[in-house]
Curated annotation (Swiss-Prot):
Pfam families: Ribosomal_L29. The lineage of its organism: Bacteria, Bacillati, Bacillota, Bacilli, Lactobacillales. InterPro entries: Ribosomal_protein_uL29, Ribosomal_uL29, Ribosomal_uL29_CS, Ribosomal_uL29_sf. The gene is rpmC. Keywords: Ribonucleoprotein, Ribosomal protein. SUPFAM superfamilies: Ribosomal protein L29 (L29p). Belongs to the universal ribosomal protein uL29 family. GO terms for molecular function: structural constituent of ribosome. This is Large ribosomal subunit protein uL29. GO terms for cellular component: cytosolic large ribosomal subunit. HAMAP family: Ribosomal_uL29 (MF_00374). GO terms for biological process: translation.
Length: 69
């Protein structure tokens, strides 16, 4: 993910409410589960997607922590 894409994603995440962030995190965790299952089955072609989803989950959690301060 390019820096400009990351900044855009963070801007979008900061515009969301706490409930929307929680929903987004749950969606990402389900996507990560599905990707891990595909990787274990040998059907995942783009393995970089795993790292991207993990980092996005971390970004969502960071924004949630910022809102809880």
């Amino acid at each position: 993910m390019k820096l400009s894409e990351t900044k855009s994603l963070l801007k979008d995440l900061r515009a969301l409410s706490v409930e929307e962030l929680t929903t987004r995190e749950a969606e990402l965790k389900k996507e990560l589960f599905d990707l891990r299952f595909q990787a274990a089955a040998g059907r995942l072609e783009n393995t970089a997607k795993l790292d991207e989803v993990k980092k996005t989950i971390a970004r969502v959690k960071t924004v949630q922590a910022e809102l809880n301060k």
